[in-house]
Amino acid sequence: MKVTVIGTGYVGLVTGACLAEMGNHVVCLDVDARKIRILEEGGIPIHEPGLEAIVARNRAAGRLQFTTDVAASVAHGTLQFIGVGTPPDEDGSADMQYVLAAARSIGRHMTDYKVVVDKSTVPIGTADRVRAVIAEELAARGMADTAFAVVSNPEFLKEGAAVEDCMRPDRIVVGADDERAILLMRALYQPFMRQSDRLQLMDLRSAEFTKYAANAMLATRISFMNELARLAERVGADIEQVRRGIGSDPRIGKHFLYAGTGYGGSCFPKDVKALIHIGREHGVELQVLHAVESANERQKHVLVDKVVACFGADLAGRTFALWGLAFKPDTDDMREAPSRVVVDALLARGARVRAYDPVAADEARRVLGDRPGLEFAASAADAARGADALLLVTEWKEFRTPDFDGLKAALKQPLVFDGRNIWDPALLAQMGFEYHGIGRAGG
């Protein structure tokens, strides 16, 4: 099947590469010539395990192409995926300019039937706006009778596991009201559903809502567990034991029950804000989501609060090792990362920060800038050397079983703040460390 994907960011590139992997002929369009040049030279602008290999393989096979040619891209695919960004505006609403610009380009260049697929996370009712924009462009060209359909097909990709999620989806949500489009979408996704039919067909607005509802629910679980962790510390309970206890209930499940330093990234913060804004537009105050957002912002300060409790408010002359900068493992994404809050707060109190991340260091340098008191270490061991304490912010696998003897010798004092509860407090205490976790007894 011939497919066009508009946008070569996180969503567009992963979607295009995985569709090509299943034998489709995919053209990925982007107006950013620099990004297209990088892709054509074999570069990958984002860190995502498995993506580089799948892109290279399908480019070599001739199934995946990159271009800035709008007219040729629109002509290529019957299916036109829109996978551009929807960044938040100042009021929390999703900025729709890129989605509508893509729709307008399709309307300006299409000459036959197209299925326009909204893959980006978009506000409820976007399909109607996309349809109106395309119809307006067709009418201006005297082609008002040209048939097309608009479909909502939200992505449910986890950064760090996006290729796996795309190739083996747990569900495929399709919102559509056009039978021809439904048949084409089912045919496109049939190779992804050989073991069971995972396609969930619904109306357009329900499909658009499903994406926001899913991310809001996951963000709620994270903030709820972080709230319980704060209480656990006060009452002498261990949130890790509580997590296992409640996660064994099948009505609750084991996922997204980990206390930590708060959520970040490109999706949860943006989508919670957008859903709050949508609710307000329709006269519904989503009070739970307000609390989720507030709790998450507070949680990003929890590690520094613990540092202050140990060292006092004035941290001048102190150096802290920081392990992990990306908002989660297996990505270089620094958007809304808790580490940004931690670094800002430590520097504001006069401390020096020596940070290490196995993947996100370059992106962190770009985001955090060249600031007095901040340096980037070449390894976890280098970051810890001579530091007053270690703060673990992102749970990269290489941090799970470090050389604790070497770490103890490297630090001025054996003091660790475990922001992701990946270490065993009893084991570290036995080894002579002072341990502070999130929601751990004595934490």
Per-range role (PLM):
Residues M1-G443:
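Structural/interface elements that position substrates and couple domains in central-metabolism enzymes
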